Amino acid sequence: MVFQQFYLFENMSVLDNCTVAQIKVLNRDKESAVKEAKKYLELVGMIDHADKKPSMLSGGQKQRVAIARALCMNPEVLLFDEPTSALDPEMVNDVLQVMSKLAESGMTMVVVTHEMQFARDVSTRVCFMNEGYIIEDTDPKTMFTNPKHERVKEFLKNYLNN
């Protein structure tokens, strides 16, 4: 799971943030954990920051490290909880590009987001929640061009007019 607030261990390097769970939870040896961490840090464009502490990184960089850390656990499904909501607008695109690459690679992702263009472009299914309930569940084209529920129509009218 990738959270909106990153939750990196501030006292550990980027590399250590990506290896600790592999060693403690998956019982990987350190060498294998480091190899896996470097592979995913490379994928998210953060390998050059492997020795840095999180306090030396921007919000977008921290989020990319959090994505690498999650990938190191070899999940079948990756859950993102508002991965861009805590970022400066300039950093959002970097994170969305990484997520787009993951989608293109076939990674199954469940993404809670307000990034409508991203949802439209990358998703195979889109759910709209209102007051804790899914009120519409369909493909992106239908969701954005012909939604069934009035609340979704209202939301999209406001979104598309801004």
Predicted regions and their residues:
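ABC family nucleotide-binding domain
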Residues: 1-140
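C-terminal boundary and immediately downstream tail of ABC-type ATPase nucleotide-binding domains
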Residues: 141-162
